[in-house]
Amino acid sequence: MDFGKRLWIAMVVLCACARLLPHPWNFTPLMAIGLFSGYQAAKASTGILVTLSALALSDLVLGFDRGSWFVYAAALVAVLFGRITRNHGVGAIVAGALGSSLSFFFITNFMVWASGRLYPSTLAGLAACFAAGVPFYQNQFAGDAFYTLAIFGGYALLKRSFRPLHQAA
């Protein structure tokens, strides 16, 4: 098995395990892996497959509900940010990580509000929902920053150490 396939399998397993192991709310590598797979994969379909596979694998244990579709959509936005930031350097990666975090926050909190189960279907209800999501966003952003640095930084270190990694995975 070539390095690229092993890399993507490792990403799927890392993300699935991180979602299953105890962790602070929203502190997972999901968005960072979506960003990295979108950025690094030669084909967009590979980034999408890696990200959705990681979610689906962990959801076999965690369960899948109506709101899960919004988490999947937010993860695909991270893949899109990865594709957009390709070949644009570190600043673009940082912007992609921030954009991924914000998109996850807005998509998932909007879904909670739109479900009508916890908040009234008014602008005040939407504002209350977003306000209640801020503590979760702090963990989301911290996790995205940590894992983006670890994954992109770790890959850069590996790339320097091993010549065959200079090709896109």
Each language-model region and where it sits:
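Central hydrophobic cores of alpha-helical transmembrane segments
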Residues: M11, G47-L57, I93-L102, Q167-A169
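Helix-boundary and loop/linker segments of multi-pass membrane transporters
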Residues: M1-K5, P24-W25, T85-R86, S121, ...
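Membrane-embedded alpha-helical hairpins and interfacial helices in multi-pass inner-membrane proteins
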Residues: G89-A168
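Interfacial aromatic-anchored transmembrane helix boundaries in multi-pass membrane proteins
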Residues: C17-T28, L52-I84
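Hydrophobic alpha-helical transmembrane segments
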Residues: K5-A10, S45-L49, W69-A73, V94-L98, ...
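Structural signal for the C-terminal ends of transmembrane alpha-helices
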Residues: C17, S37-K43, L80-N87, G154-F162
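Hydrophobic transmembrane alpha-helices
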Residues: M1-Y39
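Alpha-helical transmembrane segments of multi-pass membrane proteins
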Residues: M11, M31-L35, V71-V79, A145-T148
